[in-house]
């Protein structure tokens, strides 16, 4: 597993720990929407170095950023809609609009979404668990709240 996948996988484990009941949903009702600024560039650089000798298939597998979604999905048996977007910076408005559309059109009942960025020794992760049926202690799913939480986690 490359470092981007490790970061996303670990952030997801913290997100779901003690706060998520997957049994409430069918696997196809749980999706993942992630984004970052550098795609899989950290691993792409490592892969490029291996091509000077013999290209490493083990590294090539991780030259797509959406592999992190696959690793999370396999771990938790999530089978719903998923997408990975590349933006210059965290775009809470896009995340809110995209995930809301998936929920409003009954494509998903639950979505893990957010930002998973890693390049060399710098990394940022902010994941959000969005459920169509809100609990009493839920925070409203708005771009303002996403931005506020992202900034608290990442400065």
Language-model segments: what does each one mean?
Residues 1-71, 75:
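Conserved beta-ketoacyl condensing-enzyme motif
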Residues 1-3, 7-14, 53, 57, ...:
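Conserved beta-strand-centric core segments of catalytic alpha/beta enzyme folds
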Residues 79-80:
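Conserved thiamine diphosphate
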